[in-house]
């Protein structure tokens, strides 16, 4: 009997990001909360100080909650500017989640106390902005400014889900953060839909008998 060789998935190496030349103030922008059935989509914009680096920045999803919470005050203290933008469930239902995310990113950039020369956006598309912008695929892993933005947005949204959990403990929002899990589906089936649910999302529409 011939033993089969184990196949391991090759790790895809991301190319290092080359920052465009000629820009003084660069903002990184990221979002959290496109997939959940409940709550705001939250974005953050961050301009880091190149003379005051922050160790350990990475995509917020790759960091433990403890590490994110430890990095948050350091990011806020050392950044030249940071701001949070959001769109509510009502706006998401009106615009659709993609457009609402773009609007939330615009709000985060507008909220910066210093306006950047360039905005680096995580993903493959940019919102309309008054300054130059560039989409960076996997930017939360490749660009420190985007990593910092992802950490702020993630912590802010998670904390909002924990607050919502206090109002509606039967839904378990602190655990699944509003994402479409089995426990969330069962809670909707048992307790119905709350005002913070996104009514345009298929499982919620179905629960409301609109699908």
Swiss-Prot record:
Lineage: Bacteria, Pseudomonadati, Pseudomonadota, Gammaproteobacteria, Vibrionales
InterPro entries, A to Z: RNase_HII, RNase_HII/HIII, RNase_HII/HIII_dom, RNaseH-like_sf, RNaseH_sf
Subcellular location: Cytoplasm
Signal peptide: none
Biological processes, Gene Ontology terms: DNA replication, removal of RNA primer; mismatch repair
E.C. numbers: 3.1.26.4
CDD domains recorded: RNase_HII_bacteria_HII_like
Keyword Hydrolase: yes
Cofactor remark from the record: Manganese or magnesium. Binds 1 divalent metal ion per monomer in the absence of substrate. May bind a second metal ion after substrate binding.
Family note: Belongs to the RNase HII family.
Annotated a divalent metal cation binding sites: 30-31, 122
GO terms for cellular component: cytoplasm; ribonuclease H2 complex
Domain (RNase H type-2) ranges: 24-211
Cofactor: Mn(2+); Mg(2+)
PANTHER family: RIBONUCLEASE H2 SUBUNIT A (PTHR10954), RIBONUCLEASE HII (PTHR10954:SF18)
Record gene name: rnhB
The keyword Cell cycle belongs to this UniProt entry's keyword annotation: no
Primary localisation category: cytoplasm
Identification of the protein by name: Ribonuclease HII
Keywords noted in UniProt: Cytoplasm, Endonuclease, Hydrolase, Manganese, Metal-binding, Nuclease
Physiological role: Endonuclease that specifically degrades the RNA of RNA-DNA hybrids.
Pfam assignment, any one: RNase_HII
NCBIfam families: PRK00015.1-1, PRK00015.1-3, PRK00015.1-4
A GO MF label: manganese ion binding
Main enzyme class: hydrolase
């Amino acid at each position: 009997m011939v033993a089969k060789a184990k196949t391991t998935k090759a790790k895809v190496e991301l190319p290092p990001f080359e920052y465009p030349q000629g820009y003084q103030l660069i903002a990184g922008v990221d979002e959290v909360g496109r997939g959940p059935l409940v709550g705001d989509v939250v974005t953050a914009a961050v301009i880091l100080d190149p003379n005051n680096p922050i160790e350990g920045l990475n995509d917020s999803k790759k960091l433990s909650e403890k590490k994110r919470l430890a990095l948050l005050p350091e990011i806020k203290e050392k950044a030249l500017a940071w701001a949070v933008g959001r769109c509510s469930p009502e706006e998401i239902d009106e615009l659709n989640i993609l457009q609402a995310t773009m609007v939330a990113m615009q709000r985060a950039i507008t909220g910066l106390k210093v306006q950047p020369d360039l905005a680096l956006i995580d993903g493959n598309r940019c919102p309309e902005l008054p300054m130059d912008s560039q989409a960076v695929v996997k930017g939360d892993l490749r660009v420190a400014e985007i990593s910092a933005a992802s950490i702020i947005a993630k912590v802010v949204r998670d904390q909002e889900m924990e607050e919502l959990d206090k109002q509606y403990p039967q839904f378990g929002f602190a655990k699944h953060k509003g994402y479409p899990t089995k426990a969330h589906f069962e809670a909707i089936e048992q307790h119905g839909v709350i005002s913070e649910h996104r009514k345009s999302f298929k499982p919620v529409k179905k629960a409301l008998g609109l699908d």
